[in-house]
Every structure is written in structure tokens, then in C-alpha cells.
Amino acid sequence: MRVRQLAALVFLIFALIPGVALAWRARHFEHLGYFHDDGMYWIAAKSLAEGTGYRILSLPGMPYQTKYPPGLPFLLSLVWKVSPQFPANLPWAMLIAAAMLPAFAWVSVRLLESWGCSRCAAMVVCAWMVLNPYIVLFGVSLMPELLVATLLGCCLLAAQKAVQQDSTRIALASGILGGLAYLTKTAAMPLLIAGPIWFALRRRSRLAWWFVAPLLASVVVWTTWSTRHTAPSTDAVTIYYTSYVGDYLLDLRRFEWVTFVWKNLPVFLSSIGNLLIPDMKEVPLIGQYFPRLVGLFAITGIVRRMRQDSIGLQHWFAGGYSLLVLVWQYPPNERFLIPILPLFAYGAQAEVRHLAAGVATAWRSDKRDQRAVAGMFAAIMAAVCLWASSMLVVAHLVLLPGIFSRYHAILASNRRVYEWINLNLAHAEPILTYYDAQTFLYTGHPAMRLPNFPKQYYRQDWHLVARTYAELPVFARSRRARYLLLGETDRDDPFLKGIVDWKKLTSGASYHLLVQQPMAEFYEIEPPR
């Protein structure tokens, strides 16, 4: 047994090496702003460190940052305090980002053990999780998903221990950890409902109060502060930057959440599948349905274990969290499901064990047809394992290196544009760009994103999207912006591709090319006459 545990531990340690290697390669954060949110977190951290309040320094008017809670920015602000020079301080930020991956792995091992896995199995499952390219990518990004997943895991472990020992002190600690998770990412709010339900069903209502008190305090404090400081605006761009709820309610039609759920559900299942077996290439014959089948497989395992054991706090939270991302106005891609990935991984391994036990039983049967079926299922399982392993190899040898090589080239082009801006533009000139955080950090110019169309994606209102971009000079004038920075990723945006012809658009009379680089173009926009 010790030999198996040692082998599993070695596998887990080796599974962390690709993430460490990528963190070293990407330590200068050429990909800063890849998710947009990461740039906003980094700028909010700068604001905290400089003592200017919790603000969006890059946005014209510098409104308060009332969209993202301050958990991660507070942590990153320590980097700005110790090393305030940008971009020289970015490698220090990578230390914080990279530390989240082993922390997530350790907490996930403890979680799976607490749910019934052996330590050996838990380490193997978590090693597979941290090898996933989506997890590795977030392990080298200034995003809160791994941090909130770690805090949630600690919260769940403490809550389970509080019930086992009937301890109010541990229940309080669990609530504090839940509050920290909420202050890192507000999507942790389902804990506020899941916790009391679970404690009550376990006949520990007294502990529920100790759990809820610090969690509720975190929700009340952040909600009160953000409500009082939200910029009073009906402008869609400002609302996007400053309010999740405001952005959701803006132009929301009656019962439109039903459309969100209908279109988000297949993405939800695919994202679960991709976090377990990455989709570097479509499976022959099955194609896009393979990740969904993997997602359903994991959910089946969760349900099976629930029926055999009982409904835990992790199930109540995952149910509430899943409902939240399904009704949201953005497709629930892999990023959104990282906080509940350990549960899906647990469900997948439970179902694999169940299937393997069934195959072994059938193989020992005297009936030839049962042995034939067992052989078929064994072959399918072996093929899936081989396919999954090959996808990891492709991800680490081809996909991830390609992504970061591309962003190295993009930043090189952008920095030449930034040098031109610093030499030729007045300091306060706002710039329209999807690289708003990066543009502000390298030039000091206020910057803002181009129009955002979450609801049009669900409505398939491509005409409105095309018209809005055709009228971009009007949009720019309304924001007092005269300049536009376009990058390579803008042209390849999967939502806009086929709708917006950037080459045709920027060849119009309102656009004057000022700087052209291999992967970036900088324009002056004249308002229409």
C-alpha cells in the first residue's frame, strides 16, 4: 500500500511540473489581458497599492471597481507595494498565480479523500486534473478560479469536520473561508443557501448559524459598498465594467433566462467533459458530442454516489452554482466550472470504478456473450484512456506552446504601437481596444473595450452586431475616443468572425491608419459628418 501511495504521490508531483515550466516561460505575462478580467484584477491591485481606492484606473473617469470583489486584487496589491515598477513586477505576480495550482491540487486530494476515495486514488485523480491544459492555463493567469476553488475546498472540509466534531468553532472557521471565497468571486454565493440546508438536514442547525454569520457579513459588506459606489450610469460600457447584475438586467427580455439555459446546457456538459478529457481534436465519428458524453458520465457517477451515500454540502453547492451559470448570459465555458471540478472528477472516477467492476464481473462469467460484452467495454475504456492521454500530449507539446508563442508575438507588435503612442499622443487621449488593461499599463492612456454583445449571441441578432460596428465612429465619439487599437485576436474572435469584416470596416473614410505592425494596427477615427 505504501508503495502505491508513493507512486501516486510521485505522479502528482510530476503532474505539476508542466504547470511550473509554463509559469517560468510565461513569467513576463505576455498574455496579460487574454481573459480581460485578468487585466482588470491587476489594475484594481495597482489602485489598492497606490492608495487611490478600489478603482478602475484604466477606464475614463476612474470609477470604483464595483464588479469584482477585492480578494484577488488585495493579494496582488502586495506585489505592487513591493515592486511598483511595471512590467518588471510581473514575474512576482507569477509567483502568486503559480502557487495556486499546487494549493488547488492539495485541497482537492483532501476533498476526494473526505468523500470516500483512497489517498492513492485521490492523488491520481488530482494529478490528472492538474495536467489538464485548461487548469494549467489558469495556473499561469491572474484569474480567481483556482483561488476560489481552493478556498471553497477548505470551506467544505471545515464544514464536514464541524459536523463530525459538533464544533461551533470549526463551523465559524468554515463560514469565514466561505466568506473569503465570496470576496474572491461572488459566484460562491450559493454557499449562503447550501450551507444552512445541509446543516439542517444533518440536524446541526446550531452550527448553521455559526457558518452563516461570517459568510452573510461578507455578502452584506461587499454588496453595500459596491451598491453605494457603483457609477450612476445607463451607459452599456460603464455598466459592463462596474456591475454584474446591471449588465445582466440591461435589455433583458421577459423569460429570456429560459433561452440562456437552453443554449448554455450543451456548453455546460461540454465544459465538464473538456476539464476531464481536453478537446484538442474532435473524436472521429462522435465529434462534438464526445465532451458532452464525458460530462454526462461524470454526472452519472455523482448521482450514483449520492444514492449510495447521502447528499453532501458539495452537492447542494454544486447544484446552486450550476443553476447560476446556466441562467447567466455568457456560455459556461471551462473557466466557470473550475470551482466545482473536484466534484465532477470524483463522479467520473466513481463511475469508472463502477464500470470496471461490472466489466470484471462479466469477464469472469461462464456465458460467452457476457464475456464478449465485457471485452467490448474493456476495449472502449482502453481506447478512451489512450485518446485522453494523447490529447494531453498534444496540449502540452503543441497547443500551450503555440498559444504563448502567439501572445509573445502579439505583445511585441503591441509594444511598438505603445511606443508610438507615448511619443505622439497627448496623455489623456482615450483609446478603444480589447487590450484596454494592457494599453493603460504600457501607455498611461485611459482605455475601454469595444461594444459587448452577450445577449445578441443568444438572440442571434447578427444584424444589430454588424450595424453597431459599422457605426463605430459614432460609438467612439460618444465616449470621446479618437483612437482604435486592433489586434490579431480581434480579427479571430469566434463571435465576430463572419459578422464584422475588419478590413472593409477600417478602409472607410472615418479611419486613418497611424501605425501598422504584423499583429496590430492603430487608427485615428474621425466622427461622421
Regions found by a protein language model. Name each.
Residues 8-13, 176, 192, 212-220, ...:
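Signature aromatic-anchored transmembrane alpha helix within multi-pass, membrane-resident enzymes
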Residues 70-74, 82-103, 138, 142, ...:
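Loop-to-helix entry region of an early transmembrane alpha helix in multi-pass inner-membrane enzymes
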Residues 92-116, 154, 158, 296-303:
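Transmembrane-helix motifs of polytopic, lipid-linked glycan transferases
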Residues 114-116, 155-173, 181, 306-309:
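Membrane-interface transmembrane helices that cradle and orient dolichyl/undecaprenyl
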Residues 138-139, 145-148, 181-186, 190-193, ...:
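Hydrophobic/aromatic-rich transmembrane helices and adjacent perimembrane loops
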